[in-house]
C-alpha cells in the first residue's frame, strides 16, 4: 500500500471528509496523494455529503488540496458546457464545502462583483490552466467511481449537509467588506 486515507469518527467537524493523508516517501510526487483526495470526495458523493479536509492544512496539504480543487472546479465550469452554475450547484456536483469552493474561485480570480451580485467569470488564464490540467490528466492515477463498493455509515442523528446558502452569502459579504 502506497498511501492511506484516515477518517475517524471522533473528528470535531461533521463535514470533515478526511483527517489525514499519508503517502510514504518512496511514493511521493507520483500522484497517490491526489488519488486519495479524489477517493475521499468520491466517497462523499456516494454519501451525498459535502466535505472538507480537517483544518488547518499543512503547507503540502494546502498545495495538494488547492491544486485538486482548482482542477475539479475548472473541469466542471469549463467542461460541463453549462452556462449558469451557482456556488450551490458547484458544491452539489463536487461535494466541496462552500468556503473551499469560494476560496478556490477567488484564488483562480473567477469571482467578479457586478451590480450587487457575485458572478463566476471564466478568464482566458483559467482556460489555459484547464488545458494544462487536461494534458496532465492522461498520466494521472484516477478514481473510477463505478468500481467503489461502499455502504455509507448511517448514524442516528440527521444532518443537512446542504445547509450552505446562508454560509455562502456570509462568506461573500466578508470578502466584500475586506
Predicted regions mapped to residue ranges:
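Extended, composition-driven regions rather than compact fold-specific motifs
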Residues: 1-30, 35-178
Amino acid at each position: 500500500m502506497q498511501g492511506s486515507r484516515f477518517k475517524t469518527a471522533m473528528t470535531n467537524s461533521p463535514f470533515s471528509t478526511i483527517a489525514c493523508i499519508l503517502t510514504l516517501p518512496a511514493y511521493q510526487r507520483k500522484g497517490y496523494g491526489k488519488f486519495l483526495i479524489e477517493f475521499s470526495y468520491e466517497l462523499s458523493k456516494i454519501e451525498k455529503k459535502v466535505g472538507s479536509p480537517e483544518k488547518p492544512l499543512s503547507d503540502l496539504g494546502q498545495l495538494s488540496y488547492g491544486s485538486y480543487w482548482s482542477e475539479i472546479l475548472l473541469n466542471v465550469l469549463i467542461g460541463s458546457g453549462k452556462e449558469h452554475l451557482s456556488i450551490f450547484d458547484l458544491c452539489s456536483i463536487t461535494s466541496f464545502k462552500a468556503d473551499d469552493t469560494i476560496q478556490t474561485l477567488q484564488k483562480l480570480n473567477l469571482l467578479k462583483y457586478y451590480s450587487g451580485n457575485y458572478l463566476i467569470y471564466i478568464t482566458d488564464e483559467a482556460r489555459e490552466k484547464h488545458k494544462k490540467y487536461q494534458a496532465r490528466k492522461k498520466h494521472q492515477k484516477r478514481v473510477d467511481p463505478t468500481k467503489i463498493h461502499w455502504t455509507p455509515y448511517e448514524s442516528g442523528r440527521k444532518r443537512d449537509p446542504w445547509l450552505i446558502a446562508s454560509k455562502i452569502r456570509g462568506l461573500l459579504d466578508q470578502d466584500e467588506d475586506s
